């Protein structure tokens, strides 16, 4: 776990489940966040080790996102503020045509992106701007004797026990408040604060899982996304959190 550029450029590929909602936007998100880390670390720029596609996205973001742009995005207090930030606009310039192309034959929105999808990507940009320490693992073993393989989602990190071994990093009350949120602004605000807290506690976060789960939540919010309660993100998060905490 590290926030160095080299770790982010790991050849460890995202799992299919971790990119279910990101789809063709996965490499866009990875390159966009990599640019934010370059700014934060003031590190030597990479030379496209993640393939030509990712390298092209990264070069675009290097020319469109400055240090002040990244700082302004991180300081946003509301999703409406995010929409006006150059760092988000650069991301959306790559995401929007990709979404339109991928949904053109499967959606009523053949020539535009839904308002819900736009809001979801505002949330992705805002929350991911809080992440400065990155974990590139997509599966992790639980801390207990069972050593069960769990998806390396935010819930998995939140459910890890603190050093004293008695409490999870995020208290059950605070976690339940997040998964009980029904309003997008409330959910995203709580999520951004939780991510910031985990980062302050020295915890690394997988940004692909995080972005994918944000899109999952907004798909659930839009309705008719799941067939059973277990398909909902909040249910999956709750199961992972308590498995990690109680194992």
List the predicted regions and their residue ranges.
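Basic, alpha-helical nucleic-acid-binding regions used in initiation and control of genome expression
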Residues: 2, 10-247
């Amino acid at each position: 776990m590290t926030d160095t550029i080299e770790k982010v450029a790991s050849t460890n590929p995202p799992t299919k489940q971790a990119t279910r909602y990101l789809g063709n936007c996965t490499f866009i998100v990875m390159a966009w966040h990599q640019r934010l880390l370059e700014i934060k670390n003031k590190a030597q720029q990479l030379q496209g080790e993640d393939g030509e596609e990712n390298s092209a996205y990264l070069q675009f973001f290097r020319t469109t996102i400055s240090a002040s742009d990244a700082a302004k995005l991180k300081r946003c207090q509301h999703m409406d503020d995010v929409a006006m930030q150059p760092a988000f606009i650069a991301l959306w310039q790559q995401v929007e045509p990709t979404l339109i192309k991928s949904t053109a034959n499967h959606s009523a929105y053949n020539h535009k992106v839904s308002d819900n999808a736009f809001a979801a990507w505002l949330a992705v940009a805002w929350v991911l701007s809080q992440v400065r320490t990155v974990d590139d693992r997509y599966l992790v073993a639980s801390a207990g004797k069972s050593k069960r393989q769990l998806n390396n989602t935010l819930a998995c990190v939140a459910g890890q026990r603190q050093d004293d071994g008695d409490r999870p990093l995020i208290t059950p009350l605070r976690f339940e408040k997040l998964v009980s949120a029904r309003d997008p602004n409330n959910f995203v605000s709580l999520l951004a604060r939780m991510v910031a807290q985990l980062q302050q506690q020295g915890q690394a976060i997988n940004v692909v899982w995080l972005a994918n789960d944000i899109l999952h939540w907004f798909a659930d919010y839009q309705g008719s996304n799941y067939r059973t309660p277990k398909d909902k993100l909040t249910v999956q998060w709750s199961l992972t959190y308590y498995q990690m905490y109680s194992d």
